[in-house]
Amino acid sequence: MDDKPNPEALSDSSERLFSFGVIADVQFADLEDGFNFQGTRRRYYRHSLLHLQGAIEDWNNESSMPCCVLQLGDIIDGYNAQYNASKKSLELVMDMFKRLKVPVHHTWGNHEFYNFSREYLTHSKLNTKFLEDQIVHHPETMPSEDYYAYHFVPFPKFRFILLDAYDLSVLGVDQSSPKYEQCMKILREHNPNTELNSPQGLSEPQFVQFNGGFSQEQLNWLNEVLTFSDTNQEKVVIVSHLPIYPDASDNVCLAWNYRDALAVIWSHECVVCFFAGHTHDGGYSEDPFGVYHVNLEGVIETAPDSQAFGTVHVYPDKMMLKGRGRVPDRIMNYKKERAFHC
């Protein structure tokens, strides 16, 4: 039985304000097809670039063009580093993105750090922090240079926030640095396995090397931005490579301190949805506080005859994801206004 909602049929109920594109885990490499670590799922390394091309052509030809595209991380595969092809593969993907007629906001995932150091990424075309919007007279909403996160306003009364899920991580960091030592200590405290990418026997399986977490500094900043959005009655979309809600994700793929991120988000009224990648399988759930968690299906594990991307149409009362291929359609109604008591 197909209970998939039909956004086209429901879109007449209110005027569309704007739209934006979403895509995750392209993981391009100029290699023949392979499999995941367990050898159970095929990965289409070379064809992923053609999927990206198809998505860009689709967005460019939409009757109401998206205002921007959110790229949810893992844009090239870690295998590139083994073949000394990281820069070349990134250049091919970025050349493809040049065909897109709207801005793209890039999130960083584990595969970015398999290929490049954090310092390299900070000075690369994958750093789209220059697209941020600064809130005048509110310095507390300015992100630190210590992590890669920012916010922007695609449309009045809507704010998008990109988070750095590898702010706490042993990936892409100088191994002689205090930050590396701090993050390795966190990882070792929760994961005694010799192979740190293995969740075997862990009570908290998210503590593996291919995941990361949010520093307290970044969470404090997120809290300040959400406080501003609450006060100014903005609707907020949050983006991260790593998911933070267990019901929408494999537990092995969650951010290390996902509970801390949820605690911040749940203390505010303004957040509509949280987009993530990383799982490749996709996932979806509405949490008890009315926040929708959308984990996008990964391009890398999408067969040549399918697709994996979407366009989110934004209305005064809801957001509607129109998926392509493996990505299902979703309807995300805004929370009903709660009464404020003095």
Curated annotation (Swiss-Prot):
Give the catalytic activity.
CDP-choline + H2O = phosphocholine + CMP + 2 H(+); ADP-D-ribose + H2O = D-ribose 5-phosphate + AMP + 2 H(+); CDP-glycerol + H2O = sn-glycerol 3-phosphate + CMP + 2 H(+)
Q: So which cofactors does this thing need? A: Mg(2+)
E.C. numbers = 3.6.1.13, 3.6.1.16, 3.6.1.53
Superkingdom assignment: Eukaryota
Keyword Hydrolase among UniProt keywords: yes
InterPro entries, alphabetized:
Calcineurin-like_PHP_ApaH (IPR004843), Metallo-depent_PP-like (IPR029052), MPP_ADPRM (IPR041869)
Q: Where does Zn(2+) 2 bind?
A: 74, 110, 241, 278
- Name of a matching Pfam family: Metallophos
Spell out the molecular function terms from Gene Ontology: 2',3'-cyclic-nucleotide 2'-phosphodiesterase activity; ADP-ribose diphosphatase activity; CDP-glycerol diphosphatase activity; manganese ion binding
Cellular-component GO terms for this entry: cytosol
Keywords, comma-separated and alphabetical? Acetylation, Hydrolase, Metal-binding, Zinc
CDD domains associated with the record: MPP_Nbla03831 (cd07396)
Residues with PTM N-acetylmethionine: 1
Q: Where does Zn(2+) 1 bind?
A: 25, 27, 74, 280
Top EC group = hydrolase
- Partners and quaternary state? Monomer.
Function of the molecule: Hydrolyzes ADP-ribose, IDP-ribose, CDP-glycerol, CDP-choline and CDP-ethanolamine, but not other non-reducing ADP-sugars or CDP-glucose. May be involved in immune cell signaling as suggested by the second-messenger role of ADP-ribose, which activates TRPM2 as a mediator of oxidative/nitrosative stress.
Into which family does the record put it? Answer: Belongs to the ADPRibase-Mn family.
Q: What is this protein called?
A: Manganese-dependent ADP-ribose/CDP-alcohol diphosphatase
Species annotation? Homo sapiens
The organism's taxonomy opens as: Eukaryota, Metazoa, Chordata, Craniata, Vertebrata
